[in-house]
Amino acid sequence: MQTRPSSEPHRSRDQVTDGDRNRDQPQKCASATLAKKPVTPPAAPPPTPSNRVVAPLTVPVIQLTPAQSDSPVKLARPATPKETAISVPDHSNKENQPARTPPPSKSCPLGAPTNYVARRTWITTERMNELRRKAQEAAKQNKIFTIRGCFNSVRNALLMRGWVEKLDVHRKVMPAGQMTYEDLTQRLPKRKAGETRRQYVQKCERNIMSRFLEHMPVDFLWTNRKEKCDYIDQAKNPGMTINKFHRAPFTSKEGLCSQLRDFHWFFEEGTAEMYFPRCYNVWSPEELGEFIENFKLTACVAFLRAMLCKYHKQGSDAVFSCSGKIPYSAIDFAYKRLVEYIDSCQHNDIDFEDPPKIWEHDWDAFLFQHQQLVNEDGRIQHDGGQRLEPMVKSCLSLVDKMKVHWPQYSLDGYQNMWIVKPANKCRGRGIILMDNLKKILGVVNLSIASKSRYVVQKYIERPLILFQTKFDIRQWFLITNTQPLVVWFYRESYLRFSSQEYSLSNHHESVHLTNYAIQKKYTNGKRDKRLPSENMWDCYSFQAYLRQIGKYNMWLERIFPGMRKAIVGCMLASQENMDRRPNTFELFGADFMICENFYPWLIEINSSPDLGATTSVTARMCPQCLEDVVKVVIDRRTDPKAELGNFELAYRQVVPPTPAYMGLNLFVKGKQVLQKANHGGGHGHYYYQQQRKERSLATSSVYRQRSAIIHPATSISRIHRAMPTFNATEYMEKYMVEPLSSSRSSLCSQLPQKSPSAAPALTATPSGATSSYILKQAGRSITQLLSATHKRNTGGSLSGEQVQSTALPPKRQRSCGPRLSSTNPVESTEKKFKILIKNYSSNGNENMQDARPEVANSATATAISERKWRSLRNIAATAGGSSNLAARSKGPPLIAPPSLPTRRLTRTKSEIDSTGMHAIGRTFGRKSNGPRLPISISVQALHRGEPIVAALKQATSELQLSQAQMMSPRTALANKLNGSTLMVPASALPVG
C-alpha cells in the first residue's frame, strides 16, 4: 500500500478497497470553464476520485461542463462507522500488513474525514458546486469580506446578508491556477469540543468558499489594527471598505490634548460644546512651564477654599490657633497671587510696573504649607490680636471673583491632585495620581531622558459618586466620513464602577481608575450592596437611579446631550488632521466623568474599545452595537431609509456647493499707468538674461543697490522679480560706441591718429546740422564723435568725407561681459531724455596761451581728493603711452586752469534727487591708450531705455569748446581734474 503525504493520514485497507470498487462505476467530474470559451476535456478513462479537479474562481462567470457523459453523478454509498473513524496505520509493515482500524472513541471529537469517500458523505460534488456558485455570486455583487479577530456578531450579520468570508490565512497559492477536490478539503479546521455537527460543517464550508476566493480582492475589511499590507490593498482596490482610519489623532492622550487646544475656534452653542479637564503635554518645555504656573495658582485657590470651608463648617478654632505651624503670612501670599491673576485677566496690569519677583523657595514653602493645611489638618498661627471677620470676608469675595476667571472652578477641590498618564498607552497602564510638584517633575524629567512622553491632567476631585463609589460612562460613537464630517451617536451606554469606595486620601488605582482591565484584578471591597457585583450598569439602570433621587431630567437635559455635543466638538477640532480616504469608518469609545453639577467631562477617546462579553451588560450591548454598525455602514449604503438600530445621526456637516462654471472670462479692466521698459528697440530682455547668466549677482554692487532701493516709478510687478545687473559703460559701448556685431575690445588703439595739419578746415555749422550729423555717427566711438564735433566747430568741412566704422578686433577683456552679436539700429528719443551742461566757474585767471598750464589751486586739489581720482603721475603715464611719456613728464604737473569752466551732465525731464542712484561705469580702452575716464549715467534712465545718443546730441549742440581746449591733451586732463564727468582719453585727441 502506498503511503499518503505527511499532511494527510494514511488510508486503511477498507478505504483502498472502496476506492478500487468505485473505479468501475461511471463518474462525472465538475470542472470550471469560461462561459465565452467552454472547455471540454478529451475522452479518456474516467479519473479516480482522488484526482478530481475543481477550478478556482478566476472569472466572474463560470460554467459547469460534464467530463465524460451527461449522466448524473453516482454518489458513493454511505460510510460505515469504521470508515468515518480516525484510522491509525501500522508502521511495522506498510506494504504487506494492512492498517488496523481502532474502534470509535467517545472522548475524542470527530475531525474532518480523512479520505475522499468519507468526505463525500458530508460534502458532495453537488454541494461543492453550490458553494462555488455562491462564491461566484458574492464576487459579482462585491460581497467579499475579511474579519481579523473574534467579531462573530459582524461575521454573522454579513453572512445573513449574502456575504462570503475570505479567511485571512497564509496558505500556499496553487501555481497551476486550478485546485483539486483534495486541495479544497484538506487542512480543514478541527472540530472543537461541544461543537455540533451542523456548526462544524458550516465552518468547513466557509473555509472551502474562502479557498474559491483566494485570488479575489476584499470588499470589506474589519480589523483591530490597520497593518502595512492594508495600505497596499487600499491603493490597489479603492472601493474596499475598512473599519480603521489611518490618522485619528484624538485617540491618544497626547493627541487629544493637542487637538482640543484649538477647540475655541469650533465652538458652536447647542452643537459643539465641551468640558475637558486642563491637560498639558509636559514633554514640551513651553507646556511644562504652563503646567507649573497653573499648579501654583491652583494651590493658592485650594488653600483659600480649604480655609474658608473649615472656618464655616467647624469654626475658627479648627483653622486658627496660637500654636499653629502655618504662618499667617501664607494667607496674604495666596491672596496677593490671586489678585495679580485677576488683574492680568482684566488687563489691569498693563499700566502698572512688573509684579514683584517671587522666588522658588517662597513657592516651595507655600506649597508645603498647603499640604499641611489639607492633608495634615494643620492650623494657621494667630495670636488673637487681629479680627478674623474682615479677612474672611475679603477672602470670600476674592474666591467669588475667581469663579468668573477660573472656568474649571467646579472641577477642583482642596487637594490639588493631578493625574500623570503615559502619552500613548491604554487600559490604564502607567497612570499615577500625584499632588506634589517635585514628584511630578521627577517623573516627567525622567521620561524626557528615557524618550517616553507623559501628559499631566487635572484630576476631577469632586465627581458624582454613586453609593460612595466612583464611576465613569463608556459611550460609543461612529464616524462614517470625515469630509464632510458625519457622526453617529449610540443611544445606549454603560457605567463602570471601581471596586473600592472613593477617597482622596487613598491614591491606589483600584479607587480611582474604573477601567475594566484594572478592576478585574481586584476583588470588591466593603461597598453598598446596591452596587452591581460585576461593577457595571447600563444606562437604563442609571436613569432609574436618577429618577429615585429626583434628577431624572438631568439625563435628558445635561448628561446625554452634553456627551453628544462634546464628541461633535472634538471631531470638528480634529477634522483637519484625520484621514480623508473614502469608504472608511470607525467605531470609537469615549469615556466621560460626571461632576456634582451633572455636567459630563470628556476624559479620553479609545480607537479600539473593548467589545468583548466580559459581563452580562457587555454581553448584551456589544453584539447589538456591532450589528447596528453593519446596519449603518452596509444597509444604509443601498437603502437610505434602512433601519439604523440604536444609532442616531448626531452631526452632518453641510458643505456649500461649488458654484457652477458659466464660462466667464474674468479679466482686469483698466489703463496702464507706467510704461514698459524699452531698452533701445526692444532688445533689453534678452540682453539682461544673457548678462545674468554669465555674471554672478553677488559680485555686482549695482544689483545690491537696486534690490534694496526701488525707484518710485518702477512697476510693482518688478519688485518680486530678480532685477538684472547693469553696467553703464557696457550699455554705452553697445548702443553708442561699438558696432553691435563687433566684439568689445579697446577702441582707442584702432583709431587713426591724424595730425592737425592733415585735418581739413572746418566751418561753423548751426546746431541743427550738428545734431543731424551726430545722429549719423551713432555707430562710431565717442572719441571720433567728439573729435569730429570739434573740427566742425573750428571751421572744418566734412561734407565730402564718408566716415566708416572702424573694424574692431575679436579680442575682448575677460571682465567686459558677454560678446554682443546682435545688430539693432539706434532709436532717437530726443523728447525722453535731455542733458544739460551746467557751467561751474572756478576761481583764477584763464591762461590758454600755454599748452601746459602752470597755475595751481588748492580748491582744485581738494576736489581731486574728494573725488578720489588717481594720482597725476598715473594719469600722465597712462595718457600718453610709451612714446610720449618722457616728453610729458618733463613739463610741470598737469593742473587745470583756474578759469576753465567745469561741466556736469544732468537731466531736465526730472531733476535728479539726492536718492537717485548713479553708476560709475567702467571705461573703455586699454591701459596703454590713455587714462580711464568715468562716465556718470543715471541707472533709472538707462534701465528705461532712454538712449544716450539724444543726450549727446543736445550736449554737443550746447557745448562750445575752443580749439585750444580740444587740441591740447593736457587741457582735457585738466577738465577731468576740475570735475567734468564727460571726458575722453587724452591719447585719442589730436596732438596740437
UniProtKB/Swiss-Prot annotation:
Compositionally biased residues, Basic and acidic residues: 7-26
Subcellular localization, as worded in the UniProt entry: Cytoplasm, Cytoskeleton
Binding site for ATP: 457-460, 470, 472
Superkingdom to which the source organism belongs: Eukaryota
Keyword Nucleotide-binding: yes
One GO cellular component term noted in the UniProt record for this chain: microtubule
Cysteine-cysteine disulfides: none
Any one GO biological process: flagellated sperm motility
A GO term for molecular function: protein-glycine ligase activity, initiating
Domain (TTL) ranges: 295-645
Statement: the UniProt record of this protein carries the keyword ATP-binding: yes
Start-end of Pro residues biased regions: 39-49
Keywords recorded for this protein, A-Z: ATP-binding, Cytoplasm, Cytoskeleton, Ligase, Microtubule, Nucleotide-binding
EC number: 6.3.2.-
Region (Disordered): 1-54, 68-113, 746-766, 791-828
Functional description taken from the UniProt entry: Polylycylase which modifies alpha- and beta-tubulin, generating side chains of glycine on the gamma-carboxyl groups of specific glutamate residues within the C-terminal tail of alpha- and beta-tubulin. Involved both in the side-chain initiation and elongation steps of the polyglycylation reaction by adding a single glycine chain to generate monoglycine side chains and by elongating monoglycine side chains to polyglycine side chains.
PANTHER family linked to this entry: TUBULIN MONOGLYCYLASE TTLL3 (PTHR45870:SF2)
Stated name of the protein: Tubulin glycylase 3A
Species per Swiss-Prot/TrEMBL record: Drosophila melanogaster (Fruit fly)
